[in-house]
């Protein structure tokens, strides 16, 4: 390992650190790896779930998580009314494309820590006979100062995907340090234990840079501990993920490692889809990473909405010889894409 003498000049030390960073990036890029999917194509040119009516989903239906249960596709999605209040909608499908929605949300703000803007961005992972739902409570009510608005990662459990037991906020920001200083969001749980622990990737803020990816571990899926005192995956200048590196659907275990799809945003805040491979023996170690996005906004409804130029993948289902990817378009609609299993 290259060591930088403590007496070196600031410029020399900075140069050496840059060299170290380039060596690390080269090492990641050198690992041969092919993602477990082929080219992505849209299964439908139009949204498969869109806002409707005057109620809880009148302004937005997006950022879906999908699992298969008893032969049906079950979707939880972020719903938004015209006042900006957030809740989780519920829909089912026989074919993964045409969904029937419940007339009422399956989760609304009820717990004291959820009061404010509501609950959003579900991610589902089944372990044993229990479904674990990570979601975000977001305080965005009118009149709250911008520096007081925040989001925290929460957990709920269920056996039927309808009745949920809240487990509380599961990651508390460490405001005194340099990492995980403000918001926590987007918990993507690894489906099986590694080294005797469960692992989860999530979004948080570093003091010098917002929207980085962290990693935590747990023995019971309820109580979580930071694995590192720095991000496990950082943004990269000049690339599609220069501003945001946010976990997508829960990862899958492949022969090559822990495979995670993530959502990246560039300097213009265009959101597209990347991937990263972590070591199965050490979930904090990056083995390979996408150098360009595999999916990006193209359709008008992906470019124009509540937030322009966004495809945000949160749902992933293997359906025989194909993958189904469920995503939010421009923070307003739900879309679905597919790719062959490799």
Task: Describe the role of every protein-language-model region.
Residues 16-26:
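Bacterial N-terminal signal peptides
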Residues 13-18, 207:
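Primarily membrane-embedded glycan-assembly and transfer machineries that use lipid-linked glycans
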Residues 1-10:
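N-terminal secretory signal peptides that target proteins for export/translocation
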Residues 30-117, 126-243, 252-309, 320-342:
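Beta-rich carbohydrate-recognition and catalytic domains
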């Amino acid at each position: 390992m290259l060591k930088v003498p403590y007496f070196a000049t600031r410029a020399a030390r900075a140069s050496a650190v840059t060299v170290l960073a380039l060596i690390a990036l080269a090492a990641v890029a050198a690992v041969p790896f092919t993602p477990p999917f082929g080219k992505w194509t849209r299964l439908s040119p139009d949204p498969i779930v869109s806002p409707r009516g005057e109620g809880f989903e009148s302004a937005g239906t997006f950022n879906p998580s999908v699992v298969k249960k008893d032969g049906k596709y079950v979707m939880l999605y972020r719903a938004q009314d015209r006042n900006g209040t957030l809740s989780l909608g519920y829909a089912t499908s026989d074919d993964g494309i045409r969904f029937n929605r419940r007339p009422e949300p399956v989760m609304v703000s009820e717990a004291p820590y959820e009061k404010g803007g509501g609950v959003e961005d579900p991610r589902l992972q089944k372990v044993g006979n229990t479904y674990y739902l990570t979601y975000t409570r977001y305080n965005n009510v009118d009149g709250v100062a911008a520096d007081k608005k925040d989001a925290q990662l929460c957990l709920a459990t269920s056996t039927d995907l309808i009745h949920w037991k809240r487990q509380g906020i599961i990651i508390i920001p460490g405001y005194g340090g340099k990492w995980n200083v403000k918001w926590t969001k987007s918990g993507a749980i690894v489906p099986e234990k590694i080294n005797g622990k469960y692992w989860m990737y999530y979004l948080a803020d570093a003091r010098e840079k917002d929207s980085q990816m962290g990693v935590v571990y747990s023995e019971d899926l309820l109580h979580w501990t930071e694995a590192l005192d720095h991000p496990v995956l950082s943004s990269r200048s000049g690339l599609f993920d220069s501003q945001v590196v946010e976990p997508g659907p829960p990862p899958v275990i492949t022969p090559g490692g822990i495979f995670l799809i993530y959502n990246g945003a560039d300097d213009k805040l265009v959101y597209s889809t990347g991937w990263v491979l972590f070591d199965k023996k050490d979930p904090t170690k990056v083995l390979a990473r996408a150098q360009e996005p595999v999916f990006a906004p193209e359709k008008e409804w992906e470019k124009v909405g509540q937030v322009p130029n966004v495809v945000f993948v949160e749902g992933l289902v293997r359906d025989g010889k194909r993958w189904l990817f469920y995503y939010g378009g421009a923070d307003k609609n739900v879309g679905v894409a597919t790719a062959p299993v490799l």
